[in-house]
Regions:
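Conserved helicase motor core of SF1/SF2 NTP-dependent helicases
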Residues: 1-104, 112-186
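Walker B catalytic carboxylates
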Residues: 108
Length: 186
């Protein structure tokens, strides 16, 4: 779906709703800056380096949290899940060799991945693993990918009609009228 349709928000809300069926919710995004213009070296450990790229995921979790009063259990659950590493981030650079069982794995901005990278990610799925790819093929920041050659389009094309696969396209922008105007005219 286009920018502002709620792709990431709905993936996170769905994962939180199903959290009791899984041991962990893992969040990831490709480390690709807007227009592939990086800020350069970032200090810190792996988590500190990827946190700026993960901020949209944290922003969406914060938005979900804001829908409940601070004293409500649903508000506190997100903080508790993060503290217990039940919601965690995973740099995609370290995914090879892992076997992900009993997890929901959300990969945001999957249009910035290559078909090979998407295959590598999906083949990490162990038993009781749900993988959710979100993205918009019109928002590609990786210079050598386009609407047809990116990993998200590849998955949609290759897995359409398979039993373990589902694809949803969100069409109505919900972020703001300005975001909708930009989607339609820019």
């Amino acid at each position: 779906g286009v920018a502002g349709t709620g792709k990431t928000l709905l993936a996170l809300a769905g994962a939180l709703e199903q959290r009791n069926k899984f041991d962990q919710i893992i969040l990831a995004r490709p480390i690709v800056a807007l227009s592939n213009r990086d800020l350069g070296f970032l200090p810190g450990d792996a988590e500190e380096k990827v946190n700026p790229y993960m901020q949209p995921l944290w922003d969406n979790l914060k938005f979900i949290q804001s829908q409940f009063g601070e004293n409500e259990r649903k508000h506190r659950i997100i903080d508790e899940l993060k503290e217990q590493d039940k919601i965690t981030i995973c740099p995609l650079a370290y995914i090879r060799g892992r076997s992900l069982s009993n997890v929901i794995f959300i990969i945001d901005e999957a249009q910035n991945l290559t078909p090979h990278e998407v295959k590598t990610i999906i083949t990490r799925a162990g038993e009781n693993c749900k993988i959710i790819l979100t993205g918009d093929v019109r928002q590609i920041d990786t210079p050598y990918l386009d609407e047809q050659s990116n990993g998200l389009s590849y998955v949609i094309d290759r897995l359409r009609g398979k039993d373990l696969y589902c694809h949803v396209t969100l069409e109505k922008g919900e972020r703001s009228e300005l975001a909708n105007l930009a989607n339609q005219h820019l």
